[in-house]
């Protein structure tokens, strides 16, 4: 199955055919660095990180460009409030962004350009637009003339006349059309500025991305991504600028991730339901947040709530618990790298063997269907269930069963590398989650282990009543015991 991508421009899933065979160019709009990133930023960046990883996994040489908008009204306002230079603000929050993304396990893009490093390219594109009649200078500002570009608004499917008729646009005598947008803003007293043919000033937001994407990916490239909120006006304006300047298609596949709601409501500072990544990671493990994001299709809205985060953590615990059990069974054993041909397997082993044989093809089938990470995780959970059944049935390991367990670990490492998941040592990850949960409980891990040991001794002595009492006591405290041939483990419910 060929990779198909939902293209906002066509409204359909289009087969991915890169501009240059074997290569893929992708540009994703980065953050405006004036504050800490919120969970909406987490979703966008995790989504396109997985797309970047999967393209590479599929054999493409990927050039991934994700920019920083490091000059903007919001940055200037923040600098004025704090009485510092705008670069102090931008550098502070670029560093904070990088820290947040590292905690979420993101791979570094190929290039991370900053707008202020590309003023020459920005000015050059604006000059071209003026020369071609698509832009005009007005009192030190430069505006894009939207009526000069007949296909304006084709990405969002809007109608310019309808927008003008229903718009509440502030009258601006410097504009020929109320919908015209700024390419260059003349400088104001006390604001940072750069020299240009139209006087000192700074670029508009939209032209920055056009210039930076052209520099690193060319006049036409494969994939442009961002949140749905960027379709209009940002991406619409990027198309108008870039195609008018270059006379060719700008982007072949437009991708947009869905919104993040908070307890079924739109995230908003005014509603008091605005959460930064840092605030969320004070309560939840970074991999749990990543798993939560990937548990839904990237185009669907997701509802951020404690219940849904706890459900995501429980799902991730199921996978890590399975992998920890596999590690325990293989510990100290000579594990064959290849299946042992002709060796007998118990019924659950035959089922597991069958699941593993098709796992990669089914994983790829899900990911090739517009990067359906929710379906891909479903394939992995099937393998977890089959592995757990096999582990419950198996006694002493044989070369054939050990080879099967080794295959489980290799396949989860392979798929996990694509998703940016399962990167921790399973036992250590589970222990850290237990510790975080137990910090909020009335019973310590040491006390739990003592009771488990007492229960084991009681069962050895055939005192099953006492064993059941201990199990029920722990259950009342939210501790669930899990018995297996390898011993007894526990989870916090």
Curated annotation (Swiss-Prot):
Cofactor(s) named in the record: Zn(2+)
Motif extent ('KMSKS' region): 266-270
Superkingdom per UniProt: Bacteria
EC numbers, comma separated: 6.1.1.16
This protein's record includes keyword Ligase: yes
Span(s) of short sequence motif 'HIGH' region: 31-41
Residues holding Zn(2+): 29, 209, 234, 238
InterPro entries named in the record: Cys-tRNA-ligase, Cys-tRNA-synt_Ia_DALR, Cys-tRNA/MSH_ligase, Rossmann-like_a/b/a_fold, tRNA-synt_1_cat_dom, tRNAsynth_Ia_anticodon-bd
Pfam families reported in the protein's UniProt record: DALR_2, tRNA-synt_1e
Chain sites annotated for binding ATP: 269
Cell location: Cytoplasm
Swiss-Prot/TrEMBL GO biological process terms: cysteinyl-tRNA aminoacylation
Primary enzyme class: ligase
GO cellular component, one term: cytosol
Reactions it catalyzes: tRNA(Cys) + L-cysteine + ATP = L-cysteinyl-tRNA(Cys) + AMP + diphosphate
Transcription as UniProt keyword: no
Family: Belongs to the class-I aminoacyl-tRNA synthetase family.
Subunit structure: Monomer.
HAMAP family: Cys_tRNA_synth
Protein name from the UniProt record: Cysteine--tRNA ligase
Gene name of the encoded protein: cysS
């Amino acid at each position: 199955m060929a990779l198909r991508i939902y293209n906002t421009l066509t409204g359909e899933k289009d087969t991915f055919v890169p501009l240059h065979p074997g290569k893929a160019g992708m540009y994703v709009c980065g953050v405006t660095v004036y504050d800490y990133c919120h969970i909406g930023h987490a979703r966008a960046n995790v989504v396109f990180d997985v797309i970047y990883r999967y393209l590479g996994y599929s054999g493409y040489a990927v050039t991934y460009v994700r920019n920083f908008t490091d000059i903007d009204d919001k940055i200037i306002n923040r600098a004025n409030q704090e009485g510092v230079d705008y670069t102090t603000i931008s550098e502070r929050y670029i560093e904070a962004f990088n820290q947040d993304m590292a905690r979420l396990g993101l791979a570094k893009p190929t290039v991370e350009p900053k707008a202020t490093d590309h003023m020459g390219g920005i000015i050059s594109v604006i000059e071209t637009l003026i020369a071609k009649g698509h832009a005009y200078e007005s009192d030190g500002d430069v505006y894009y003339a939207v009526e000069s570009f007949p296909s304006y608004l084709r990405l969002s499917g809007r109608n310019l006349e309808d927008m003008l008729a229903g718009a509440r646009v502030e009258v601006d005598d410097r504009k020929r059309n109320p919908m015209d947008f700024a390419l260059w803003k003349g400088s104001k007293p006390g604001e940072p500025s750069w020299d240009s043919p139209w006087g000192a000033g700074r670029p508009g937001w939209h032209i920055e991305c056009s210039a930076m994407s052209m520099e690193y990916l060319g006049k036409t490239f494969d994939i442009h991504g961002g949140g749905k909120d960027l379709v209009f006006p940002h991406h619409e304006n990027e198309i108008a600028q870039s195609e008018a300047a270059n006379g060719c298609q700008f982007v072949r596949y437009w991708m947009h991730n869905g919104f993040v709601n908070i307890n079924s409501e739109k995230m908003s500072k005014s509603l008091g339901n605005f959460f930064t990544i840092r605030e969320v990671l004070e309560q939840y493990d970074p991999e749990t947040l990543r798993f939560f994001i990937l548990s839904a299709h990237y185009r669907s809205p997701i509802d951020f709530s404690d219940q849904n985060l706890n459900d995501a953590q429980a799902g991730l615990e199921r996978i890590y618990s399975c992998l920890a059990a596999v590690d325990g069974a293989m510990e100290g054993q000579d594990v064959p790298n290849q299946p042992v041909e002709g060796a007998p397997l118990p019924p659950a082993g035959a089922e597991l063997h069958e699941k593993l044989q098709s796992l990669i093809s089914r994983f790829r089938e899900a990911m090739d269907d517009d990067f359906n990470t929710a379906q891909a995780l479903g394939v992995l959970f099937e393998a977890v269930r089959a592995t757990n059944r096999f582990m419950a049935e198996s006694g002493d390991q044989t070369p054939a069963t050990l080879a099967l367990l080794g295959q489980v670990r290799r396949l989860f490492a392979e798929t996990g590398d694509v998703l940016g998941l399962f990167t921790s040592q399973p036992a250590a990850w589970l222990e850290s989650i237990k510790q975080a949960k137990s910090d909020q409980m009335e019973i310590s891990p040491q006390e739990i282990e003592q009771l488990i040991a007492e229960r084991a001794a009681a069962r050895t002595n055939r005192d099953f009543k006492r064993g059941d009492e201990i199990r029920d006591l722990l259950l009342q405290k939210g501790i669930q015991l899990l018995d297996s041939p390898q011993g007894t483990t526990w989870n916090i419910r």
